Amino acid sequence: MSHPHSNAVKSFLLDLQDRICAALEQADGKAQFAEDAWSREAGGGGRSRVLTGGEVFEQAGVNFSHVHGDALPPSASAHRPELAGRRFEAMGVSLVIHPSNPHVPTSHANVRFFIAEKDGEAPVWWFGGGFDLTPFYPQEEDAVHWHTVARDLCAPFGGDVYPRYKKWCDEYFHLKHRNEARGIGGLFFDDLNEWGFDKSFAFTRAVGDGYLDAYLPIVARRKEQAWGDRERQFQLYRRGRYVEFNLVWDRGTLFGLQSGGRTESILMSMPPLVRWEYGYQPEPGSPEARLYTDFLPPRDWV
């Protein structure tokens, strides 16, 4: 089972993984990615790459997977019930970067391509993805830069694209059980096929390529900033929100687990260290409080 364009998408994704890993290694200056190639009994496989104990990045995971199966899992068809139970092919690159320095934000990006097939009917395909930023000690200029890159890469595809996918990102990366945003958002899109294949693929490439343009300048600006135990403790506490979101709400995590994916690769997004504290409240007016008052409530950055 293969869509006529599967090979083009796959080669883009493999190249994207290579380029992102090379750029992150260069930004770190010390650690390198270790690769773990894996295959899946039900069909497909992937290559997981993880960097640990770096100068800048405590842990960075950049995963490529290409899987297929006999029945689309519930997480993938929840919004498309007409596709439930179809044969499927899914491929994507997903990454989560957890820096050591609390002044450097955590970042996440993902681009993916799905095909669902049923005998006697035309295959249904779509793209999805996006990127989002999770700062601990956010800076206005970083938020503006992140969203400017997002807006500019969307511009050639239509003036309504950035506002729509920015809003979707704010809504998606929201911890409903805390009524709190995970971070300052970015872009999120799914079920993209109405533009036709070429334009949809071009947009997905622009998102994948735009991630490094959005993230690396922020890393460069913040990685030398001084920090101590107070900042580290707050970073570890806020990382708890990342864990809560990924295990409770994230459709990608659920899809991976429901489709019999590789658990180590799926949970590669987890921060290496994290802590919870009962009833924590930041001191009013503190830098920690500013995250909650000035940055987490969704706002128009550009």
Curated annotation (Swiss-Prot):
<feature type="site" description="Important for dimerization">
    <location>
        <position position="177"/>
    </location>
</feature>
<comment type="function">
    <text>Involved in the heme biosynthesis. Catalyzes the aerobic oxidative decarboxylation of propionate groups of rings A and B of coproporphyrinogen-III to yield the vinyl groups in protoporphyrinogen-IX.</text>
</comment>
<feature type="region of interest" description="Important for dimerization">
    <location>
        <begin position="242"/>
        <end position="277"/>
    </location>
</feature>
<dbReference type="Pfam" id="PF01218">
    <property type="entry name" value="Coprogen_oxidas"/>
</dbReference>
<keyword id="KW-0479">Metal-binding</keyword>
<keyword id="KW-0350">Heme biosynthesis</keyword>
<comment type="similarity">
    <text>Belongs to the aerobic coproporphyrinogen-III oxidase family.</text>
</comment>
<comment type="pathway">
    <text>Porphyrin-containing compound metabolism; protoporphyrin-IX biosynthesis; protoporphyrinogen-IX from coproporphyrinogen-III (O2 route): step 1/1.</text>
</comment>
<dbReference type="GO" id="GO:0046872">
    <property type="term" value="F:metal ion binding"/>
</dbReference>
<feature type="binding site">
    <location>
        <position position="94"/>
    </location>
    <ligand>
        <name>substrate</name>
    </ligand>
</feature>
<feature type="binding site">
    <location>
        <begin position="260"/>
        <end position="262"/>
    </location>
    <ligand>
        <name>substrate</name>
    </ligand>
</feature>
<feature type="active site" description="Proton donor">
    <location>
        <position position="108"/>
    </location>
</feature>
<dbReference type="GO" id="GO:0004109">
    <property type="term" value="F:coproporphyrinogen oxidase activity"/>
</dbReference>
<keyword id="KW-0963">Cytoplasm</keyword>
<keyword id="KW-0560">Oxidoreductase</keyword>
<feature type="binding site">
    <location>
        <position position="108"/>
    </location>
    <ligand>
        <name>a divalent metal cation</name>
    </ligand>
</feature>
<feature type="binding site">
    <location>
        <begin position="110"/>
        <end position="112"/>
    </location>
    <ligand>
        <name>substrate</name>
    </ligand>
</feature>
<feature type="binding site">
    <location>
        <position position="177"/>
    </location>
    <ligand>
        <name>a divalent metal cation</name>
    </ligand>
</feature>
<dbReference type="GO" id="GO:0042803">
    <property type="term" value="F:protein homodimerization activity"/>
</dbReference>
<dbReference type="InterPro" id="IPR036406">
    <property type="entry name" value="Coprogen_oxidase_aer_sf"/>
</dbReference>
<dbReference type="GO" id="GO:0005737">
    <property type="term" value="C:cytoplasm"/>
</dbReference>
<dbReference type="InterPro" id="IPR001260">
    <property type="entry name" value="Coprogen_oxidase_aer"/>
</dbReference>
<comment type="subunit">
    <text>Homodimer.</text>
</comment>
<dbReference type="InterPro" id="IPR018375">
    <property type="entry name" value="Coprogen_oxidase_CS"/>
</dbReference>
<keyword id="KW-0627">Porphyrin biosynthesis</keyword>
<dbReference type="GO" id="GO:0006782">
    <property type="term" value="P:protoporphyrinogen IX biosynthetic process"/>
</dbReference>
<protein>
    <recommendedName>
        <fullName>Oxygen-dependent coproporphyrinogen-III oxidase</fullName>
        <ecNumber>1.3.3.3</ecNumber>
    </recommendedName>
</protein>
<feature type="binding site">
    <location>
        <position position="98"/>
    </location>
    <ligand>
        <name>a divalent metal cation</name>
    </ligand>
</feature>
<feature type="binding site">
    <location>
        <position position="147"/>
    </location>
    <ligand>
        <name>a divalent metal cation</name>
    </ligand>
</feature>
